[in-house]
Each structure stands twice: as structure tokens, then as C-alpha cells.
């Protein structure tokens, strides 16, 4: 199978018009006979809003509940992308980490992906479907939602590309390349020329 993983960041899915554009990009890959796996971040600002709400509830919000809360933004974006693809006549559905499952280990807020069950997604791809997978999240051995840390949707996409032997992993973002820190926030950010995972 010729698989491509497309990852869309918060800016790319930040408005309904941008989500419509994302659907057009996905459709172009489908037309070129790719089996497309999509990984989405939350819409721009959604995660920060959820983090702020957790702090308003209490200063020491439970790490376990924090992961449940902040991972919900990806669910919204995935559903909107899938809905737009369906409107365009493309078989699609959103997938959360527990539905696949994407297995993680480590602490809440800072877990890492250690395995992905490929079976459901492979069947879905073979049926012509486009899975829209929530980035940034997984489930641990206790079946609790965990997050991979800020920027974790990129890590999710890269790991999914690895587990599914994708031909390419393309990350759509609002910066050109990988930087030492967010270049939109710090002018001193340096672009990394070569990186491995």
C-alpha cells in the first residue's frame, strides 16, 4: 500500500475555511492513489483555552484529568475534517487514540508512544476510507488517556508514519522547518538543518 501521513497543525485547521482547504489537500492525495492517514492538532488556540480553564478550576489540576481535558481539542478538529470529507463524497471518520489503540508509556502530560495497533486502520484504509486521527494523545496500560506534551501531534504523525511504513510524512505548519523553539515567539529560534527521530 502506498501510504502517506498528512499532519495538519492548529493554524492549518484554525477556521472552517482552512478545514475546507485541508479537505481539498487530502482529496488531491486520494486522486493520486495514496492511502491517506491524517493526523490533526486542535484548532488554533483551543488547547491554550483548555489549559487556562484547568488553571481557573484549581492551580494544581490533576495531571490525569489534564490529559483528558486538553486532548479534547483534537477530537473537535478531527470530526470537522471528517465531516467535510464526507460532504465531498470521501469515506472518512475520526479516530481517537483509544479506538485504534495508540499505546503510550510514561508520565501524564509527557508520555511517549510505544506501540500502535495497526489492524483497524489498515482495514479502514483497504476499504477506501481516510482515517482522521487525533494527534497528541494515546492510552496507557490502565486505559487512561495520556498526552505526549505540547507539539505532540507532530510526534504522533511521525510515529504513525513509522508504524504504518508510510512512503511520506508531511507536516503542514505555519513555519518553514523545525526550529529550536517557536520562531513565532522567540526571534532567536534557530532552524535545524538535519534531524532524525
Which residue stretches match the model-derived regions?
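Nucleotide/pyrophosphate-binding catalytic subdomain
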Residues: 1-197
Amino acid at each position: 500500500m502506498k501510504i502517506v501521513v498528512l499532519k495538519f497543525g492548529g493554524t492549518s485547521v484554525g477556521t472552517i475555511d482552512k478545514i475546507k482547504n485541508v479537505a481539498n489537500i487530502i482529496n488531491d492525495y486520494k486522486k493520486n492513489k495514496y492511502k491517506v492517514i491524517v493526523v490533526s492538532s486542535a484548532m488554533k488556540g483551543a488547547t491554550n483555552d483548555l489549559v487556562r480553564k484547568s488553571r481557573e478550576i484549581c492551580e494544581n489540576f490533576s495531571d490525569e484529568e489534564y490529559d483528558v481535558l486538553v486532548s479534547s481539542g483534537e477530537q473537535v478538529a478531527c470530526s470537522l475534517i471528517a465531516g467535510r470529507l464526507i460532504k465531498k463524497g470521501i469515506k472518512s471518520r475520526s479516530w481517537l487514540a483509544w479506538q485504534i489503540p495508540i499505546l503510550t508509556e510514561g508520565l501524564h502530560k509527557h508520555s511517549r508512544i510505544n506501540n500502535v495497533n495497526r489492524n483497524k486502520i489498515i482495514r479502514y484504509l483497504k476499504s477506501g476510507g481516510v482515517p482522521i486521527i487525533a494527534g497528541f494523545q494515546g492510552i496507557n496500560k490502565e486505559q487512561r488517556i495520556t498526552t505526549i506534551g505540547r507539539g505532540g501531534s507532530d510526534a504522533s504523525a511521525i510515529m504513525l508514519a513509522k508504524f504504518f511504513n508510510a512512503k511520506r510524512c508531511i507536516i503542514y505548519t505555519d513555519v518553514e522547518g523545525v526550529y529550536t523553539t517557536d520562531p513565532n515567539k522567540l526571534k532567536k529560534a534557530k532552524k535545524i538543518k538535519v534531524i532524525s527521530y
